[in-house]
Structures are given as structure tokens and as C-alpha cells.
């Protein structure tokens, strides 16, 4: 199992999916976020945050501070590649080295998946 919170990893993945327009990825990972302890209010907040330049900061009341940092971190990794050193210090102050690597790996891996899904125009299955 992961050392990093599954909820935080899924939040990072959902952030990547929304930022890249990978609807298939979001369709499959939003339920995983909820199953990991996330709330619909947080998903709604994430959708609002995505519309308001989350790489520069997240101000949604639905999120605790750690979740705000995770969304901002995923946004910076996705949009800028480079991450602000102060943001990294905030995360590293609360997460172990292993947790930081797991969170970063999840965000990076799903950036690759998102780009594949969007380029190939893979969309969610019909229900």
C-alpha cells in the first residue's frame, strides 16, 4: 500500500484530469477520490479551483490546507512542470520523503496517462 494518503493522491490525479481535459481519467478517478474519503463538496470545489488558476493558489473553503497545497502542487506540475520551492517546503514539512515521492509519482504518471487519453480522444464509456 501507499504511505501517502490515497485521498491526497486521488485529489492530485483529479486535478490533472480536469486541467488536461482528460474526461475519461476524471470519470474513473472522481469515484476513487470519494471512496478514499473525499467529499462531493471537495470535487465541486476542485472544479471551481480549476477555473481560477490553481497553480497560483487555491482558496476553496471545501479544502483543508494540505488539500489546497496538493491541488496547487498538481497544477504547477501539470501546467509549469517546475514547482515553487516554498510550496514544496510546505508539503515536505507535512509529508515524509516517501509520501512526497508517492504523491509526485501519482501526479506525474497521470499527466502521462492524461496526455495519451486526450491525444487518442478516449472518452468515458456510456453508462
Feature locations, PLM:
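Hydrophobic alpha-helical segments
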Residues: 1-127
Amino acid at each position: 500500500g501507499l504511505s501517502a494518503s490515497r485521498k491526497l493522491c486521488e485529489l492530485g490525479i483529479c486535478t490533472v484530469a480536469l486541467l488536461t481535459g482528460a474526461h475519461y481519467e476524471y470519470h474513473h478517478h472522481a469515484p476513487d477520490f470519494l471512496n478514499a474519503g473525499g467529499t462531493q463538496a471537495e470535487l465541486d470545489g476542485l472544479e471551481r479551483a480549476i477555473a481560477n488558476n490553481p497553480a497560483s493558489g487555491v482558496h476553496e473553503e471545501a479544502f483543508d490546507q494540505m488539500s489546497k497545497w496538493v491541488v496547487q502542487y498538481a497544477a504547477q506540475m501539470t501546467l509549469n512542470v517546475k514547482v515553487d520551492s516554498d510550496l514544496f517546503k510546505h508539503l515536505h514539512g507535512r509529508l515524509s520523503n516517501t509520501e512526497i515521492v508517492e504523491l509526485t509519482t501519482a501526479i506525474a504518471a497521470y499527466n502521462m496517462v492524461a496526455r495519451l487519453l486526450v491525444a487518442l480522444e478516449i472518452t468515458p464509456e456510456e453508462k
